[in-house]
């Protein structure tokens, strides 16, 4: 469900950084949903292909987060979540002197499929099994 | 309208596979709308730039489908459509042992333009002409 | 806020073209919001990775515009804006014989963060300061 796209200057993150970041982002979501829901795409961009404010961006990280499995129940919940994400990102971005921007879009739960299955609703027995087994399987409840 | 982005391991699809997949995806939509509405982008991703569940993804295909020209009229219609898409994808993905995930987002019809034209509403005379000619042209109806 | 992704054939735009386009796009948004809100990503795509209507696309430019900071207040406002964008693009796309398609999606204002800040509402004193200084800073109003 969450699909992250991280646009970044080619030299911003090492392969180790990327693996760590993906793991830590997955930990945040994994506290409430199956870990295999979390996709993270890194898109290195040369400054000639990436502009912020009309200027080539060689110190900027832009993150797009598509949420499907969960909707924020309130503004406060979204603030807590985004603050936590900013804290996870800090050692890799802010602390290295990069600027960054992120936004979340929410897309329809019903128009989503994994390995041909339609994912179970949050906190159902089926989702609990998907989470425990960390893989999709046929639903046993409607 | 539909814009598909297919994130995949670099070796997952040959050029022939990609051309076939694009053709078959276009056939599905082309049954009800102009074929030239259908855009398909393949994005090969090295495992160090693509993580699922916090692990490098070398056997995973992630598909994002942006729908503009049509909204699903019902849950049942969306199920039929997504099941059909999963069947079209199977020989290229499931049958080769890849895991895959897809989701659809719907974006506003009115904020869409092709070659400077605003596309006609579904099933109007203008859309029928666009479809028959497989190209955009000035609208003759409001 | 606006994040543009411009999918284009590798040879469609020179580096000078890209810098000019990013500047002109930023000028349009900069008339009403901070210039640093504007992100533009160029994604060159080989024809074997980019299909329109089921055919490899070597003369097609596809633009995705994600809007966060402002929502269109009316259909008329969206038409004026998109017409203006099409006019800005024309010398680089239509006048060179390329086909093109664009669409706008609007995503939630509240789920957006820049350098750890939550951007101020349109036309507030805080936004005016962000615009005048062309950088984010701590909000002084709720």
Located regions from the model:
Chain A
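A domain-level signal for the structural core that forms small-molecule/cofactor-binding pockets
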Residues: 1-142
């Amino acid at each position: 469900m969450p699909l992250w796209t991280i646009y970044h200057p080619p030299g911003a993150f090492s392969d180790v950084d990327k693996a760590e970041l993906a793991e830590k982002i997955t930990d945040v979501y994994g506290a409430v949903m199956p870990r295999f829901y979390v996709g993270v795409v890194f898109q290195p961009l040369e400054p000639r292909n990436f502009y912020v404010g009309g200027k080539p961006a060689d110190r900027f990280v832009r993150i797009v987060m598509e949420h499907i499995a969960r909707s924020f129940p309130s503004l406060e919940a979204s603030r807590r979540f985004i603050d936590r994400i900013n804290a996870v990102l800090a050692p890799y971005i802010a602390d290295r002197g990069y600027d960054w921007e992120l936004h979340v879009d929410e897309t329809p739960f019903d128009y989503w499929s994994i390995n041909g299955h339609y994912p179970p609703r949050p906190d159902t027995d089926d989702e609990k099994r998907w989470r425990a087994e960390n893989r999709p399987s046929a639903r046993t409840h409607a």
